[in-house]
């Protein structure tokens, strides 16, 4: 369906859990408050809402967290989403630590693609960022994904003074692998709001200096997102840039977000939205829920104001769905 700005909203980011087995410094550091189990939607509630979203025009769902693979029987939820009439594509964003062992079940469930978050190729830096010694597990998950039939993307958040020196090495993973390596600007939300941002344009210029033949990939977007892709002659994969702060792409935004608590956010940066869990558990029928979904999508803000770096400190990416 269309929002009030005539944008075609057909993509739902579905945060199925706020918990995570890593403690990334910009997302969910040690001490972050987690929800009680009863506060999180059940599989049945997620699937009921997914069917209603599909009836409102959503055809693409990305399963996120927290870390979605921490959720018990998440492959069953993926299978349920794939079986929902109207939903044609189901993908997942994961930190990769549990992916190697769960990938067979996810493939059986019909998962269409996977994004893996990895900010470093150095085990010591990985521990600094995540406060956990799980680098080998992520490597295993990435290898398993690349050996599977799934399209794979790797998400990296450049961090000043942390992983700046290895960004070329991370980008070069696309040289020998059929892989889209995307560099995502630090979101000025929650814990990340206090951290300096490496801008997408700055990084693109740096890579162009390293690889003078770097050029835009024409004719494909590798999915439904805002990344702008580049490649180098002879490379198997490509490099993507998602510059939410320094390259605002709100005019073409096609998505909304449902948190694990059932709160529908029409915009990552907005405080507005609708508590669908309250309606669900309050006995609302499908017609009432569809109306709430449509009204919330219609009210999607024209644009964010990340450039002002004024997001409330109480907001956290692991709660919203990163």
Identify the role of each PLM range.
Residues 1-11, 175-176, 186-322:
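Auxiliary Fe-S-binding modules of radical SAM enzymes
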Residues 16, 35, 67-71, 159-163, ...:
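Short, small-residue-enriched loops and turns at beta-alpha junctions
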Residues 32-36, 122-129, 190-194, 275-277:
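A short acidic, helix-capping loop that chelates divalent metal ions and anchors anionic groups
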Residues 22, 123-124, 248, 274:
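Glycine-centered loop/turn positions within well-structured domains
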Residues 40-63, 70-184:
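Radical SAM/AdoMet-radical enzyme domain recognition
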Residues 4-44:
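Canonical Radical SAM [4Fe-4S] cluster-binding loop centered on the CxxxCxxC motif
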Residues 23, 27, 71, 124, ...:
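Residues that scaffold the ATP/ADP-binding catalytic core of kinase and kinase-like folds
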Residues 16, 20, 24, 63, ...:
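Conserved, mostly hydrophobic/aromatic
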């Amino acid at each position: 369906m269309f929002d009030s700005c005539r944008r075609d909203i057909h993509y739902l980011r579905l945060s199925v859990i706020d918990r995570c087995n890593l403690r990334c410094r910009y997302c969910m550091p040690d001490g972050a408050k987690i929800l009680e189990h009863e506060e999180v939607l059940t599989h049945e509630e997620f699937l009921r809402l997914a069917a209603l979203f599909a009836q409102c025009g959503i055809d693409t769902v990305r399963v996120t967290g927290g870390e979605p693979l921490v959720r018990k029987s998440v492959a069953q939820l993926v299978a349920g989403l794939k079986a929902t009439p109207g939903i044609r594509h189901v993908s997942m964003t994961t930190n990769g630590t549990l992916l190697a062992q769960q990938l067979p079940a996810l493939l059986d469930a019909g998962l269409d693609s996977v994004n893996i978050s990895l900010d470093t190729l150095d085990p010591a830096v990985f521990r600094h960022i995540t406060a956990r010694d799980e680098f080998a597990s992520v490597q295993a998950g990435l290898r398993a994904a690349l050996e599977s039939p799934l399209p794979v993307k790797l998400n990296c958040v450049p961090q000043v003074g942390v992983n700046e020196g290895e960004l070329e090495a991370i980008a070069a993973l696309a040289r020998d692998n059929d892989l889209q390596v995307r560099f995502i600007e630090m979101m000025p939300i929650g814990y990340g709001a206090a951290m300096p941002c490496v801008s997408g344009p700055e990084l693109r210029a740096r890579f162009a200096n390293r690889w003078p033949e770097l050029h835009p990939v024409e004719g494909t977007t590798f999915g439904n997102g805002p990344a702008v892709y580049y490649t180098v002659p002879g490379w198997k994969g490509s490099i993507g840039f998602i510059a939410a702060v320094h390259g605002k792409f709100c005019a073409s935004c096609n998505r909304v977000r449902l948190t694990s608590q059932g709160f529908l956010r029409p915009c990552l940066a907005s405080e507005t939205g609708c508590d669908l869990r309250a309606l669900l558990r309050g006995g609302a029928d499908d017609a009432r829920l569809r109306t709430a979904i449509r009204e919330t999508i219609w009210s999607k803000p024209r644009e964010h104001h990340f450039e002002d770096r004024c997001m409330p400190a109480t907001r956290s990416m692991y709660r919203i769905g990163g």
